[in-house]
């Protein structure tokens, strides 16, 4: 099974997704005139705005939910795996994917805001399934995407998050492969159940507290480790760029190259263009759709350019030998141990627990939004939600028992299939988001707090929001 999954993953990323991801990202980067760079400062301003009157789901809350999913085990275990298998050059290609991918993230999240729906309780919700159905008018494709997202996030990604949390404990002497994974999986499953049975409001409360705390603590310790290894920093950068452009090594073994691993782990970590973050973006109450496009663009930068980069620099500045035998969380633990000693193990484990748990919670939010889509205008039966949440908790338990290659390949394949649907869709619908961006920039130049009406960009169909 492991060999089959590996072959599928390699084919998917070698021949299809690498072209789509970079191609679509570059297309939107150029079409928006480098918007991720031009409007970076504006994205920081927008995220601090209060929600629109009558709503309590702010841009900051939406940022925390999407960042909870983006900022997870991929920022530690994923980056370490990419470096262990693809070399230091994988870091450079993660940066590339984040820069061009931020443009895709802007487009998909702006579209999610334009086509968001209003619940009977007055809350907004939406995502790719909704803009596929409403803008493309393809209910069949929308259902396929919703099912793909549920399987990917509640299944593949949460299996992988649980696996990586379990891996963080494997370095301890008391760890026993025969029964410890069952204990860790069981505890994670119970914690997951306690969170998700409280509903999406509780999820946003949990992530709004945990995400900033875990990110700040991890960054602070990472910066200390890098500072203590300052003598190795010049060699570290030399290694990153030399490995990134070693084309002989790249094309002689593309499946395990820096490019491939950088793209895989970069996509797994920042999710730009995959179609996940728009589900959080649609929930925010803002005066203009572009505001959430900017916020989700910022989330990509926080994830890759800040947190993933800190992990990479911790590993590469430590000057430990990277052979490929040691990968994932144990590699980060060994790198940190060169400067902070025995504190490295408990700290990395604690970080992975927080990163992993918020990933589980954020992923489930996306899955539940798409489950509700499958029931259309009808309320999702309570018994269905109960079974759905119970299955999600059981899958978290099962993830701790998986093998390394099986866990990562399942996540990569399912994520790739989602991107194969969402990327062509946002190319088709992208002009609407680009016109929306021009409308926003024009109002900002006039000194206004931008507001939006769908008719100003040529949308005449009936929407739940943005009507005259």
Predicted regions and their residues:
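Transmembrane helix-loop junctions in multi-pass membrane proteins
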Residues: 17, 31-36, 75-79, 88, ...
């Amino acid at each position: 099974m492991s060999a089959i999954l590996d072959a599928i993953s390699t084919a998917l990323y070698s021949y299809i997704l690498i072209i789509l991801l970079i191609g679509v990202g570059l297309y939107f980067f150029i079409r928006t005139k480098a918007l991720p760079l031009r409007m970076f400062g504006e994205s920081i301003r927008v995220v601090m705005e209060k929600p629109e009157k009558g709503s309590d789901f702010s841009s900051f809350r939406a940022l925390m939910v999407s960042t909870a999913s983006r900022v997870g085990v991929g920022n530690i275990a994923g980056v370490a795996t990419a470096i262990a298998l693809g070399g230091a050059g994988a870091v450079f290609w993660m940066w590339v994917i984040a820069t061009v991918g931020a443009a895709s993230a802007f487009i998909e999240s702006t579209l999610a805001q334009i086509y968001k729906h209003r619940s009977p309780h007055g809350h907004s919700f939406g995502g790719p399934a909704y803009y596929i159905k409403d803008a493309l008018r393809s209910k069949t494709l929308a259902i396929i995407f919703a099912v793909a997202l549920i399987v990917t996030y509640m299944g593949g990604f949460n299996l992988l998050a649980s696996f990586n949390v379990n891996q963080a404990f494997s370095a301890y002497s008391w760890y026993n492969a025969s029964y410890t994974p069952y204990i860790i999986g069981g505890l994670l499953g119970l914690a997951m159940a306690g969170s998700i049975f409280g509903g999406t409001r509780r999820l946003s409360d949990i992530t709004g507290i945990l995400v900033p705390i875990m990110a700040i603590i991890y960054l602070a310790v990472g910066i200390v480790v890098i500072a203590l290894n300052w003598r190795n920093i010049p060699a570290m950068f030399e290694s990153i760029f030399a490995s990134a452009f070693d084309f002989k090594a790249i094309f002689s073994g593309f499946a395990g190259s820096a490019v491939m691993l950088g793209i895989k782990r970069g996509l797994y970590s920042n999710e730009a263009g995959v179609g996940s973050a728009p589900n959080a973006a649609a929930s925010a109450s803002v005066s203009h759709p572009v505001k959430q496009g900017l916020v989700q663009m910022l989330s990509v930068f926080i994830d890759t350019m800040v947190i993933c980069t800190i992990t990479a620099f911790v590993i590469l500045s430590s000057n430990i030998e990277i052979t490929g035998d040691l990968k994932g969380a144990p590699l980060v633990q060994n790198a940190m141990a060169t400067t902070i000693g025995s504190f490295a193990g408990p700290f990395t484990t604690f970080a992975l627990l927080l990163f992993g748990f918020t990933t589980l919670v954020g992923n489930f939010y996306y899955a539940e939004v798409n489950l509700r889509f499958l029931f259309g205008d009808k309320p999702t039966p309570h018994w269905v939600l109960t079974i759905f949440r119970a299955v999600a908790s059981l899958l978290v338990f099962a993830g701790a028992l998986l093998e390394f290659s099986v866990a990562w390949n399942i996540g990569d394949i399912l994520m790739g299939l989602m991107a194969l649907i969402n990327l062509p869709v946002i190319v088709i619908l992208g002009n609407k988001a680009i016109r929306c961006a021009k409308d926003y920039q024009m109002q900002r130049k006039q000194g206004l707090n931008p507001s939006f009406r769908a008719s100003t960009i040529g949308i005449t169909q009936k929407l739940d929001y943005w009507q005259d």
